[in-house]
Swiss-Prot record:
Belongs to the TRAFAC class translation factor GTPase superfamily. Classic translation factor GTPase family. EF-G/EF-2 subfamily. This is Elongation factor G, mitochondrial. Pathway: Protein biosynthesis; polypeptide chain elongation. PANTHER family: ELONGATION FACTOR G, MITOCHONDRIAL. Residues 1-64 form a transit peptide. NCBIfam families: EF-G, PRK12740.1-5, small_GTP. Mitochondrial GTPase that catalyzes the GTP-dependent ribosomal translocation step during translation elongation. During this step, the ribosome changes from the pre-translocational (PRE) to the post-translocational (POST) state as the newly formed A-site-bound peptidyl-tRNA and P-site-bound deacylated tRNA move to the P and E sites, respectively. Catalyzes the coordinated movement of the two tRNA molecules, the mRNA and conformational changes in the ribosome. Residues 96-394 form the tr-type G domain.
Length: 811
């Protein structure tokens, strides 16, 4: 490195903002939602123990939902001081060998195939079975019959396994080198998640409770639409991740192009920690460029790992080049390594490995592994990487809130100590053979079979009759589960996102983000309605927060809503298979919305006199556009600015209720209203005639009066569509997207195929699957995910408004 380059690097480091500096310099708590999407939220340095005196100054508010404004308010108020529990030596030893990991990716990247190999190499299953049930068995984690038929994961599945790996880099003692220590046994909880966007809630709730993740990418397709969604979800919950480039044996595989996409499309500081030996069909193994060793899988199923210092000459230059690149990229994320790099000091494999662990845990860096799960290559080194670089439960600072304090009160750090008061989060519900199965992450304390626990939301005290650890659809009964573990309970009635305690605290945890449905359709049984029809709908609603059911007030039809056509099709099929209820469905309906584009004032009086006590309520204020809150997902709000009491306090909730009722049905097309804030400034009441009904109706009338003055528009869901097809069909594919009024965002050509990314209204995408198959001779495929709601064209809005008006007049 030249003197000029060294000087420039030092200046760059000095001029870096706090959010860009390596983590060891950054000690302030950071709220995740204050960061832009492309910036990695921070976590505290591993140098800060969860039990150290400096912990309260350095902890990251991982699950805090309060805003930065709330922090300012907290300085002016005095909050109760709490003595944090302390980890015992037994706790520390147990937690150092614990990992909670999710496996996520775009559909068909090989997540379930990878998980199957992980289970085989860790000894959890005796043989390897393939996705789609080609061998009449199917992958272990795809336990549902529909999953094996369609070859996709529909529900997330949990399991646990033990893996023997070298000691993590941060635990190395004087004289020890990375990878050459006595091996330790690690306990790994694994959740395999769906890759299809329609089942995104499964990814959402898995990442909510995990400490780390493996982001799987296809060596050919690279970063795809759902990869971007999964990355966004990982950032939302501050989940450190490793990347695994799978399918290295496929024709056209190019791992370094994929790493370029990680940096470009995901704004991720990523670099390879391995390089491939051979390519495509000649892919034979990898070179670990941290330790500069060649690694091969031998044996029929890749059981035997062979490590050697003899790196093939064909890849030696590449390995040295990528090692230099790794050190340079990693130096931007870790100050210790940066100093060695700038001083041109010798950098050992241990220096690199320790920097990787610090930078990965702090969300500053993503190590990239590579292999081929289907060819049983590169999976064991990935498991070693999970144990070496991803955090254990004591290195992730989770937060709870005290339900007895205001929402802006400081959050309480949870310590994964066994003897601490119990705090756990129910993150997934499932109807099992023996009743409701509730998946739980224990954050603090110990959960015992037969113990009494409290639901923080309902206040109810319930008994835990049975406690199990899950292995896909199999269960292993246990007597107790301690902090840092994932388990399941039978016979406990609750909802997804509920917090459970032992009753000694009033703690509650924030739930997971639940996206709004984008598509609906009517549904009815083929014959007479049976109890099973309602039973199935109730169960599916309870299990899946993105699956909604309501009865249309006009047609009296039962309407189901979800994240896409496949999402709803799966539930219709499950009703037939699991409840013996064949259903007839109507044409899919798009989830249109209405909103306002500017603020409008109202001064509305509701007055009714018909003898005796009447109704009187006057409200003054405004409605204004509102952006979606990135933390809660809410895009409507009610704000009371009344000072003095012109409207008695007991009537304020009625006004808020009236506002919520008015949102249910828009005035242009009858669709729900979104993106709107109701501000109450003033009003008046009558000593006799004012009541809750009067103010509720006044709020509805005021909202409707102001809505028409606020330049309302109709919104429609717009999807990000990604199409992959042979290059000879590019013109036809682009023409079809233009025909559907789509906006082309990006095109990429590689070898003999191309990828097109476009934004198209969901209402214009019906029937596209058949059209694409026809125009590409069955060789094209596409995926789409919800992007946002955007205004429809003015002429479309006019047609929709006219149709709605005629429908109203015909009643």
């Amino acid at each position: 490195m030249s003197a000029i380059a060294r000087a420039a690097a030092r200046v760059r480091q000095q001029n870096t903002t706090p959010l860009q500096r390596p983590l060891l310099l950054q000690r302030k708590p950071v709220l995740t939602h204050t960061l832009p999407l492309h910036a990695s939220p921070l976590k505290p340095s591993l140098a800060t123990s969860i039990t150290s005196p400096n912990f309260q100054q350095s902890f990251q508010r991982r699950w805090a939902s309060a805003s930065a404004k709330a922090e300012e308010g907290a300085k002016e108020e005095v909050w109760p001081q709490r003595k944090l529990p302390e980890l015992t030596e037994t706790d520390k030893l147990r937690l150092r060998r614990q990992r909670n990991v999710g496996i996520s990716a775009h559909i068909d990247s090989g997540k379930t195939t990878l998980t199957e190999r992980v289970l085989y190499y860790t000894g959890r299953i005796r043989d390897i079975h393939e996705v789609r049930g080609r061998d009449a068995v199917g992958a272990k984690m795809d336990s549902m019959e529909l999953e094996r038929e369609k070859g996709i994961t529909i529900q997330s599945a949990a399991t646990f396994a033990d893996w023997v790996a070298p000691k993590p880099p941060t635990e190395l003692k004087e004289g020890e080198t990375v990878g050459n220590t006595d091996k330790q046994k690690f306990a790994i909880n694994i959740i395999d998640t769906p890759g299809h966007v329609d089942f995104t809630i499964e990814v959402e709730r898995a990442l909510r409770v995990l400490d780390g993740a493996v982001l799987v990418l296809c060596a050919v397709s690279g970063v795809q639409s759902q990869t971007i969604t999964v990355d966004r979800q990982m950032r939302r919950y501050n989940v450190p991740r490793l990347a695994f480039i799978n399918k290295m044996d496929r024709a056209g595989s190019n791992p370094f192009r994929v790493i370029g996409q990680l940096r470009g499309k995901l704004k991720m500081n990523a670099a390879a920690v391995q390089v491939p030996i051979g390519s495509e069909s000649d892919f034979a193994g990898v070179v670990d460029i941290v330790r500069m060793k060649a690694i091969y899988n031998e044996g029929v199923k890749g059981n035997q790992i062979v490590e050697t210092d003899e790196i093939p000459e064909s890849v030696r230059a590449l390995a040295e080049e990528k090692r230099a690149e790794l050190i340079e990229q990693l130096s931007e994320a870790d100050e210790t390594l940066c100093d060695l790099f700038l001083d041109e000091a010798p950098i050992t494999p241990t220096d690199i490995a320790q920097a990787l662990q610090r930078a990965t845990t702090s969300l500053r860096f993503t190590p990239v592994f590579m292999g081929s799960a289907i060819k049983n290559t590169g999976v064991q080194p990935l498991l070693d990487g999970v144990c070496a670089y991803l955090p254990n439960p004591s290195e992730v600072q989770n937060q709870a809130m005290d339900a007895t304090l205001p929402a802006h009160a400081p959050t309480i750090p949870l310590v994964p100590a066994t003897d601490a008061p119990l705090v756990g989060l129910a993150f997934k519900l499932e109807e099992g053979r023996y009743g409701q199965l509730t998946y739980m992450r224990v954050y603090q304390g110990e959960l015992k079979r037969g113990s009494m626990i409290y639901n923080a939301r309902t206040g109810k005290r319930v008994k835990v009759p049975r406690l199990v650890r899950m292995h896909a659809d199999e269960m292993e009964d246990v007597d107790a589960v301690v902090a840092g573990e994932i388990c399941a309970m039978f016979g406990v009635e609750c909802s997804s996102g509920d917090t459970f305690t032992d009753g000694s605290s009033t703690y509650t945890m924030t739930s997971m983000f639940v996206p709004e449905p984008v598509i609906s359709l009517s549904i009815r049984p083929e014959g007479n309605e049976t109890p099973n029809f309602s039973r199935a709908l109730n169960r599916f609603q309870k299990e899946d927060p993105t699956f909604r059911v309501h009865v249309d007030s006009e047609s009296q039809e039962t309407i189901i809503s979800g994240m896409g056509e496949l999402h709803l099709d799966i539930y219709v099929e499950r009703m037939k298979r699991e409840y013996n209820v064949a259903c007839v469905t109507g044409k899919p309906r798009v989830a249109f919305r209405e909103t306002i584009t500017e603020a409008a004032k109202f001064n509305y009086t509701h007055k009714k006199q018909s003898g005796g006590s009447g109704q009187f309520g006057r409200v003054i204020g405004s409605i204004e556009p509102m952006e979606t809150d990135p933390d809660t997902g809410k895009d409507t709000a009610f704000e009371n600015r009344i000072i003095g009491g012109n409207i008695p306090n007991q009537f304020i909730p009625a006004i808020q209720k009236g506002f919520q009722e008015a949102l249910d049905r828009g005035l242009i097309t009858g669709h729900p209203i979104t993106g709107c804030k109701f501000v109450l400034d003033d009003g008046s009441a009558h000593a006799v005639d004012s009541n809750e009904l009067a103010f509720r109706l006044a709020a509805i009338g005021a909202f409707r009066e102001a809505f028409n003055k606020a330049r309302p528009v109709v919104l429609e869901p717009v999807m990000t569509v990604e199409i992959v097809a042979p290059i000879e069909f590019q013109g036809n594919v682009i023409g079809a997207i233009n025909q559907r009024k789509g906006t082309i965002v990006d095109t990429e050509v590689r070898d003999d195929e191309f990828t097109l990314t476009a934004e198209v209204a969901l209402n214009d995408m019906f029937g596209y699957s058949s059209q694409l198959r026809g125009m590409t001779q069955g060789k094209g495929e596409f995926s789409m995910e919800y992007k946002n709601h955007q205004p429809v064209l003015p002429n479309i809005q006019k047609e929709m408004a006219e149709a709605f008006r005629k429908k109203q007049l015909s009643k």
